[in-house]
């Protein structure tokens, strides 16, 4: 212990005597360790921590599969699954919904869920107050009840301890509060959910051919495996198909662990980020190893004297490693402070669509990770220089043979190897960043098929209790006319299906198309729109015409389709043809009056879930179906000014028609589009930042290596210049030495990049993982940086006075 304390005191004294080296080393480590700790804190919050439910590994999410792919669950099928399963301890259905909360205070749109009895018990959660939904409340005709979140209880009802049994108004209906959920409870979507109502009382979810966004939560019995559950549910699905062949042909059950379902989409991006910061730290370690090798050469006399006084190699290695560990621990402390600052930035501006990211914090796990990383980093960058510096030949050293000659030869290969590895890692990181930047630029530049500029969007939901008959149509048409009279407004329209927000789809049959088997009908995104919709959105007309004010109920039923549907099912000649819809209560065939351009509805990455689109005129919808088609509408307002500045005036028009209607999801279409690619923006900007840091470290490392080489070869350069060598040849000599190292590293890096970038393939859009232009561009950039890093010490070498150089020691 005494000798260790002595080593620490000596190391501190040595580092204090070299403030320049110590500062550079600590700052380099702080950047590398801090970046790793910050990303680990995000990974820890999002991926590592278990889901906040008892035995979360037993929780599964079930969805239906069909011949067309995955879909939501039919409610009657859910009931049959529940009755037929023996390996699941419990099973419950839920679907996302939202509700107008009215009564005391301003009307407010509440994010909510419809859940079946047993849903809360399946999660293993008990209410803070009250009780869960009972089976008697989860059926047709039951009195409406609601469970509310702790946040809503506090915000809207001031934490009223007598809230149970009181009524709140949701969508125009009185609901009795039966439970307040725990303060720390989170829905597994990790999005805010404030109200939970029984799903079984909802009439529109009870039809077997209706798939209204339901997913099924289930808990495996102890001892049951996922494979056994999948086999059992395949048998159950086959029995349902046999009983209902027309409606369940080809339908199965997809079972995924809840954690995988919730976090699976973000895991690849976060793993890539963690790998990127790991590469930055390795580059930093290589840099510091080179610095320590240079210091080791300069300290050979000191080490020789210590050997002569009896210090063994083990003691010397321990002393040198102590210095490295002190540097890494100091860098770790600064890195932890940097990580805490970065974490606060993430919490203040959390990227959208990354679950639990707002829970990121510097906790005991992050502190432990940082400490471990600091120790490992100190060993990684300090061990090789310590072993090399302590492996001196005592006799040769005392004779002075080790200085510039043998010492330099011993260190040269290791230093060059480290430099090659730095450039290899840097090129791999730069290629990855460049590919992601190109992919993001491609998504950002996608033409969505309409003009999103100066276009305001908002959502309005009508409560069924107050809007029967023609009232929905009358309301929307009045609102359209009133909003159109506002200053700077150029056009107003409404639709049931806003891009990047909602996803209504409909099966169809094209004229002349053979009736397919059940489950094989084509799907199209279904837009119910007002007159003027295409002009407001500026969707181009390809052929025919769009809806006019004269297209109303009682006239011929018209439909407008997109060019994809026209090309696939009508060979581009669709005008005058008809589209019909399967089902007994479906409308009669509709005549195609127009073909418009395809619009991007789901994602800017080019992977449209449903490639076809069709449009119906809302005024043509028969009166009994007006509420069903228009219970929720997105209002679109095109303006000549700032769309967000217009929002209060439009909201006032809604309140003027019905003061109990909340207006929500108020965004410009540009903001809505930007939000849809927020996760890609987050990961791309981070990797680009790490790549820039890696490039800076690599350039600094090469500069240091060449500068050290020049200092060691000062006498040689002086001799060359004395013998008549021109400055140009000296420049070429020094720059060439550095370029050889850089090009060797880039060669290794290119080979590594070809293998590594394949892991990015799923995150790339519009560019391949082996894009030649990207690889070539990065190689040219790195070559230019290498030339600059070598040119500065090379210029210094050409200014050496030959007489001074000949006397250089």
Task: Put a short name on every predicted segment.
Residues 1-24, 53, 67, 106-109, ...:
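Membrane-helix entry/capping segments
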Residues 18-46, 50, 283-285, 332, ...:
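Short, strongly hydrophobic transmembrane alpha-helices
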Residues 39-64, 84-87, 126, 189-192, ...:
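Membrane-proximal juxtamembrane linkers immediately C-terminal to transmembrane helices
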Residues 284-328, 700-739, 746, 759, ...:
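Interfacial "coupling" helices/loops that link adjacent transmembrane helices in transporter permeases
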Residues 42, 289, 325-397, 438, ...:
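Small-residue-rich transmembrane alpha-helices
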Residues 69-90, 466-490:
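Extracytoplasmic/periplasmic
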Residues 98, 112-135, 144-271, 344, ...:
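Mid-to-C-terminal secondary-structure elements
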Residues 1-22, 258-263, 291-318, 322, ...:
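Alpha-helical transmembrane segments of integral membrane proteins
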């Amino acid at each position: 212990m005494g000798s260790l304390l002595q080593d620490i005191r000596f190391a501190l004294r040595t580092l204090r005597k070299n403030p320049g080296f110590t500062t550079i080393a600590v700052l380099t480590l702080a950047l590398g360790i801090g970046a790793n700790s910050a990303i680990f804190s995000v990974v820890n919050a999002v991926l590592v921590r278990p889901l906040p439910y008892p035995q979360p590994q037993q929780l599964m999410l079930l969805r239906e599969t069909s011949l067309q792919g995955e879909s939501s669950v039919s409610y009657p099928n859910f009931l049959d699954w529940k009755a037929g399963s023996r390996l699941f301890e419990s099973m419950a259905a839920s679907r996302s919904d939202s509700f107008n909360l009215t009564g005391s205070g301003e009307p407010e749109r509440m994010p909510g869920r419809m859940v079946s009895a047993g849903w809360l018990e399946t999660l293993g959660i008990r209410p803070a107050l009250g009780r869960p939904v009972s089976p008697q409340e989860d059926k047709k005709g039951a009195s409406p009840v609601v469970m509310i979140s702790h946040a809503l209880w506090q915000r809207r009802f001031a934490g009223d301890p007598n809230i149970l049994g009181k009524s709140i108004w949701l969508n125009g209906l009185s609901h009795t509060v039966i439970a307040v959920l725990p303060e720390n409870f989170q829905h597994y979507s990790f999005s805010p959910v404030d109200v939970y109502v029984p799903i079984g009382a909802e009439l529109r979810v009870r039809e077997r051919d209706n798939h209204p966004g339901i997913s099924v939560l289930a808990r495996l019995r102890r001892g049951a495996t996922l494979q056994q559950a999948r086999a059992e549910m395949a048998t159950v699905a086959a029995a349902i198909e046999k009983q209902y062949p027309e409606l369940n042909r080809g339908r199965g059950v997809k079972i995924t662990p809840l954690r995988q379902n919730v976090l699976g989409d973000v895991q690849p991006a976060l793993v890539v980020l963690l790998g990127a910061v790991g590469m930055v730290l390795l580059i930093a370690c290589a840099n510091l190893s080179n610095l320590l090798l240079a210091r080791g050469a300069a300290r050979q006399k000191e080490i020789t004297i210590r050997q002569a006084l009896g210090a063994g190699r083990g003691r010397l290695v321990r002393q040198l490693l102590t210095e490295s560990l002190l540097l890494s621990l100091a860098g770790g402390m600064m890195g932890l402070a940097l990580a805490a600052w970065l974490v606060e930035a993430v919490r203040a501006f959390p990227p959208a669509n990354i679950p639990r990211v707002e829970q990121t914090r510097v906790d005991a796990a992050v502190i432990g990770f940082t400490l471990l990383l600091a120790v490992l980093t100190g060993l990684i960058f300090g061990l090789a220089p310590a072993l090399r510096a302590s492996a001196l030949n005592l006799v040769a050293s005392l004779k002075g043979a080790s200085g510039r000659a043998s010492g330099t030869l011993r260190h040269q290969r290791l230093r060059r190897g480290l430099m090659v590895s730095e450039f290899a890692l840097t090129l791999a990181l730069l290629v990855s960043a460049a590919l992601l930047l190109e992919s993001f630029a491609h998504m950002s530049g996608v033409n969505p098929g309409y003009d999103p500029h100066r276009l305001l969007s908002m959502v309005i939901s009508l409560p069924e209790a107050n809007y029967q008959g023609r009232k929905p149509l009358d309301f929307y048409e009045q609102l359209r006319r009133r909003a159109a009279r506002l200053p700077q407004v150029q056009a107003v329209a409404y639709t049931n299906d806003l891009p990047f927000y909602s996803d209504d789809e409909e099966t169809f049959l094209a004229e002349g198309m053979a009736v397919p088997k059940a489950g094989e009908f084509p799907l199209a995104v279904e837009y119910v729109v007002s007159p003027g919709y295409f002009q407001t959105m500026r969707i181009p007309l390809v052929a025919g015409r769009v809806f006019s004010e004269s297209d109303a109920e009682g006239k011929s039923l018209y439909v407008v389709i997109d060019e994809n549907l026209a090309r696939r099912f009508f060979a581009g000649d669709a005008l005058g043809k008809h589209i019909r819809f399967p089902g007994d209560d479906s409308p009669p065939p509709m005549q195609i009056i127009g073909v418009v351009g395809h619009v991007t509805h789901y994602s800017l990455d080019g992977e449209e879930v449903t490639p076809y689109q069709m449009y119906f005129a809302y005024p043509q919808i028969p009166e009994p179906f007006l509420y069903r088609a228009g219970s929720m509408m997105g209002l679109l307002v095109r303006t000549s000014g700032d769309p967000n500045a217009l929002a209060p005036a439009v909201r006032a028009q809604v309140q003027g028609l019905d003061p109990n209607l909340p207006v929500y999801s108020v965004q410009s279409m540009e903001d809505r589009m930007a939000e849809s690619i927020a996760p890609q923006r987050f990961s791309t900007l981070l990797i680009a930042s790490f790549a820039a840091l890696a490039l800076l470290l690599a350039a600094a490392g090469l500069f240091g290596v060449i500068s050290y080489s020049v200092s060691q070869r000062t006498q040689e350069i002086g001799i060359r210049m004395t013998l008549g060598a021109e400055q140009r040849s000296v420049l070429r000599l020094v720059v060439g030495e550095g370029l050889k190292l850089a090009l060797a590293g880039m060669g290794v890096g290119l080979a590594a990049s070809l293998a590594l970038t394949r892991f990015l393939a799923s995150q790339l859009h519009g560019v391949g993982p082996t894009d030649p232009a990207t690889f070539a561009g990065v190689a040219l950039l790195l070559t230019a940086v290498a030339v600059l890093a070598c040119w500065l010490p090379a210029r210094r070498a050409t200014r050496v006075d030959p007489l001074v150089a000949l006397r250089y020691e």
